[in-house]
Amino acid sequence: MKARAGGSAASGGGRPEALAALRAAGGRVDEFTTPPVGHEGPRVPPLAARGRLALTRDELAAWGERFGRAAHAPLVVTLAGDLGAGKTTLAQAICRGYGVTEAVTSPTYALVHQYASPRGPVYHLDLYRLEDPRELENLGWDDVTTAHALVLVEWPERAAGRLPAGHVPIDLEHAEGDAERRVLLAG
């Protein structure tokens, strides 16, 4: 799994909130950058800094739960990666951390699932089957991505430039061996 965080405050889920969520979720986020000259010890990286983690499926789930606990709506999180990279696994974990108690399933055929949480609604979208970004209108894209909610978007590249500013992109990939995912935190 590769994880990237970035964006601006324009969507309400801006950089400070995204960084705070990543710091709380990652636990080791501050290990990803070399401290500047004259600075003692590790520092929390700016969103433009890069870092990688290799996580097992269980570690990915634990990381996702911590991320969900730290997340604050409104927040749009995109989950990109090949089939089987762990997008739905991570979405399930984020939802658990956010307080969703019902089973979270892949919205591949329904395209969007809505879940209730004591902290507010969660929308989980899977854009894999979209053939044209104009189809987003049929999903209520503008309403969902501007709602005071946690929004998880799988296959965000199908949104072709329609992602809100300030979203948190997380890219997932298989690492060496099938048991691990790579995490990349970058701006």
What do these predicted regions represent?
Residues K2-A5, G14-A18, L22, G26-F32, ...:
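Short phosphate-coordinating micro-motif centered on Lys-Gly-acidic
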Residues P46-W63:
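N-terminal pre-Walker A segment at the start of P-loop NTPase domains
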Residues R69-P74:
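Phosphate-binding P-loop
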Residues V77-L79:
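Hydrophobic anchor at the beta1->P-loop junction of P-loop NTPases
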Residues D82:
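P-loop (Walker A) phosphate-binding loop of NTP-binding proteins
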Residues K87:
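Conserved lysine of the Walker
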Residues V100-Y115:
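Short beta-strand-centered segment that lines the nucleotide-binding/catalytic pocket of NTP-utilizing
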